[in-house]
Curated annotation (Swiss-Prot):
Transmembrane feature ranges: none
Organism: Corynebacterium glutamicum (strain ATCC 13032 / DSM 20300 / JCM 1318 / BCRC 11384 / CCUG 27702 / LMG 3730 / NBRC 12168 / NCIMB 10025 / NRRL B-2784 / 534)
One biological process term in Gene Ontology: phosphorus metabolic process
Gene behind the chain: pkk2A
Enzyme Commission designation: 2.7.4.-
Top EC class, one word: transferase
Protein name: Putative GDP-polyphosphate phosphotransferase PKK2A
Length: 320
């Protein structure tokens, strides 16, 4: 328990935080997303470069956090990179080469949904790289990142942490949801039986790559809503951006046409079918059906009232 200045005990939410209230979450998320728009405007105007690395356990909430970060950003200057398995040509290159090609130019934000740290995680655990390649990566990654930072890139690295119990629950949710089942890969399922191997790989990765110029920040992600608020808030607090006030553009008045242009007849165009009209038709039918169902109920209620009143009058007469 924590204490207020007046000595009153308060629950300590840092160890076992409760689920975030939905309304409070949505309100704060909108505020932070508005700030992200300001951040992007500053990046574009100043020519800054931002790289955000999102790593963590499978189903830890990286993807949903990225979705909220980019929801209102201009995709022309903010993009997500989720590189597939390297092809034969990429396997013959320097390991970092294919990631260098995806780095931002001036005025861009790039979010890596998994990154060069695949080598320290899945490749290490599943045996997709040799021990020599793995050790070389741990040596070169800090050097590579120092070069990025020295060149002026704002580099942020986040590790989304989730418990094994919560991960299983999320896997089960994905399995039961046809719309999200594609997110459950064979590699995800194998990670269940290799939990401790991944834990050791993560610990080793932190030891070698958590450097002052590019530190790791852990995001507690048992509650996805809480993790989204926390990671966005941290990102905004660590980049020294300023809100750039730009004059609002004026929407011009469309002048009256002075030409003899006449739009071609509607039937000359090919339109997609208006299947949405069926939704409105169904709504109207349901409303009419509900009205018809109410009428007999009202009639039955009136008859019942009449019977009660007539029964009451009869009783009074018998008393006389």
């Amino acid at each position: 328990m924590r204490k207020k200045k007046d000595g009153q005990n308060l629950p300590d939410f840092r160890k076992n935080p409760p689920k975030l209230d939905k309304k409070a979450y949505e309100k704060e998320l909108k505020r932070l997303q508005a700030e992200l728009v300001d951040l992007q405007q500053w990046v574009v105007e100043t020519g800054a470069r931002v790289v955000i690395v999102m790593e963590g356990r499978d189903a830890a909430g990286k993807g949903s956090a990225i979705k909220r970060i980019t929801q209102y950003l201009n995709p022309r200057s903010a993009r997500i990179e989720a590189l597939p398995t390297p092809n034969s040509r990429e396997k013959g290159q320097w390991y970092f080469q294919r990631y260098i090609e995806k780095l931002p130019t001036a005025g861009e934000i790039v979010i890596f949904d998994r990154s060069w740290y695949n080598r320290a995680g899945v490749e290490r655990v599943m045996g997709f790289c040799t021990s020599q390649e793995y050790r070389r990566f741990l040596h070169q990654a800090p050097i590579f990142e120092r070069l990025l930072v020295e060149d002026g890139i704002h580099l942020r690295k986040y590790w989304f942490s989730v418990s094994d119990e919560e991960q299983i629950e999320r896997f089960e949710d994905r399995l039961s949801d046809p719309l999200r089942r594609w997110k459950l890969s064979p590699m995800d399922l194998q990670s269940i039986t290799r939990w401790e191997d991944y834990s050791r790989a993560k610990d080793e990765m932190f030891i070698h790559t958590d450097i002052p110029s590019a530190p790791w920040y852990t995001v507690e992600s048992e509650d996805k809503k809480r993790s989204r608020i926390n990671v966005i808030s941290h990102l905004l607090s660590t980049i020294p951006y300023e809100k750039i006030d730009r004059p609002l553009p004026e929407i011009p008045h469309r002048p009256d046409s002075e030409s003899d242009y006449v739009r071609p007849p509607r039937d000359e165009f090919r339109y997609v079918p208006d299947v949405a009209a069926h939704l409105e038709e169904e709504r109207i039918k349901k409303e009419e059906k509900a009205k018809k169902a109410k009428k007999p109920a009202k009639a039955a209620g009136k008859n019942s009232d009449k019977q009660k009143s007539s029964g009451g009058k009869g009783k009074k007469k018998s008393k006389k």
